[in-house]
Amino acid sequence: MKTKRFLSCLAALCLTGALLWGLTWLTQKKDSYAKHAEFFEQRADYDVFFVGSSRPMNGIFPMELWENYGIVSYNWAQAGHPPPAYYWVMRLALDYKQPKLMVIDCYGMHFDAKTTGVFGLMHISMDNFPLSLTKIRAVRDMLDDPSMTEEYNEGERRSAFNLLWTFPVFHSRWNQLTQEDYRPIRNY
């Protein structure tokens, strides 16, 4: 009897987990995955990674480097990112590829905050990386700042839980879902 009850509970937990995983996948915004799909699809290593804020994001063009110099590069820069945020994006990217060179934007060294004022930008940078020990460390470090736990205008509470599991953030997107949301994510 105990074995049957244990197996029933285990099956219920597995079904609940699968349902939550599917709902999370369906309701989350796919912009992070779309933006960084090529990074995960690239088979060979990159020559150069660029990390930083809007300056390298808007001023460095990997395709130009490829066409003009044969340099394979990837631009991880994100608008509004202070150095701690792009440090962790760099660490997460290094779990997948090993470039010969890292170019780091030093513009924001004078900022005190560990994350951007617009928390949605953190989702664009972090959501595309699968859950890992490095991602957990990154989220814990970036949110280890009292000013980052406040609720901001966009309404999302700044919590590690919301960056590690996106369903609580995007669960109300039902009326915004499109055909694109039902298609598989290429790099996940």
Regions found by a protein language model. Name each.
Residues 7-14, 33-38, 62-68:
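A broad, low-specificity signal for short, low-complexity segments enriched in glycine/proline
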Residues 12-14, 42-50:
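Short N-terminal helix-initiation segments at or just after the protein's N-terminus
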Residues 51, 55-145:
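Membrane-embedded segments
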Residues 19-28, 72-80:
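Acidic/glycine-enriched edge-of-secondary-structure segments
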Residues 119-188:
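Secreted/periplasmic serine-hydrolase-like ester/acetyl group-modifying domain
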Residues 26-46:
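Alpha-helical transmembrane signal-anchor/signal-peptide segments
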Residues 4-25:
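Hydrophobic membrane-insertion alpha-helices, especially the h-region
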